Design a protein with these regions (language model features):
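Structured catalytic core of nucleotide-sugar glycosyltransferases
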Residues: 5-15, 56-66, 84-88, 113-116
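Cap/insert and terminal regions of metallo-dependent hydrolase folds
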Residues: 150-185
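Metallo-beta-lactamase
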Residues: 80-135
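Active-site glycine- and acidic-residue-rich loops that bind
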Residues: 140-152
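Active-site neighborhood of phospho(di)ester-bond hydrolases with catalytic His/Asp-centered motifs
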Residues: 26-30, 51-58, 78-81, 139-142, ...
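Active-site metal-binding motif and surrounding structural segment of the metallo-beta-lactamase
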Residues: 33-79
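Conserved beta-strand hairpin/beta-sheet module of binuclear metal-dependent hydrolase folds
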Residues: 1-43, 126-143, 160
Length: 185
């Protein structure tokens, strides 16, 4: 039996668990490690069943638990080259856990994970499809401003799809972004 659990979604943090009761992966870990752990436990999942963390992009609401959770549980991190470079520049990759560049696909335990580019104001934002050995296939794409042809191609054939986006005019108007960016958004 597969599990697809949105642990959190939104500007305060994003994280999704895909797998079974015994083994799975996280896509993003956007709150602190304690909150990620508690959310997993609330779903009846042990944090030790997480075999890898896949990062969609480097924004804080997607990586809050990255260092502490991955170090504590000894799990690897997968992300695009651009995201890994941004994470390294920001001091988020400290050598306490394995890091892998995600360019096309990865196999982690019984999971086959493929990536596709998404359009977002980040170094190299990605969405992921996850296929289990039993044929169940799920996709996660976050912070979508537009669904591109590449996103469409990435989600075709999935049993479950999580498309996440939000648009808060007040947050945008009062935020730190320069006017041309605010206008484009």
């Amino acid at each position: 039996m597969y599990r697809f659990c949105t642990l959190f979604s939104g500007s305060s943090g994003n994280s999704t668990y895909i797998g079974t009761d015994e083994h799975g992966i996280l896509i993003d870990a956007g709150k602190n490690a304690k909150q990620v752990t508690l959310s997993l436990l609330e779903e009846g999942l042990s944090p030790d069943c997480v075999e890898a963390l896949f990062i969609t992009h480097e924004h804080s609401d997607h990586i809050g638990a990255l260092r502490v959770f991955c170090k504590k549980h000894g799990i690897p991190v997968y992300a695009s080259r651009g995201t890994l470079e941004a994470l390294d520049k920001g001091g988020h990759l400290n050598g306490d856990f394995p890091v892998y560049e995600m360019s096309e696909f990865a196999d982690v335990g019984e999971f086959h994970i493929e990536c596709f580019h998404t359009m977002h104001d980040a170094a190299e934002s990605m969405g992921y499809t996850v296929e289990l050995e039993n044929g169940f296939k799920a996709a996660v794409a976050t912070d979508l401003g537009v669904i591109t042809d590449e996103v469409r191609a990435g989600i075709i054939g999935c049993n479950t799809v999580l498309l996440e986006s939000n648009h808060d005019i007040g947050m945008l108007s009062n935020g730190p972004y320069p006017y041309p960016l605010k206008r484009r958004i």
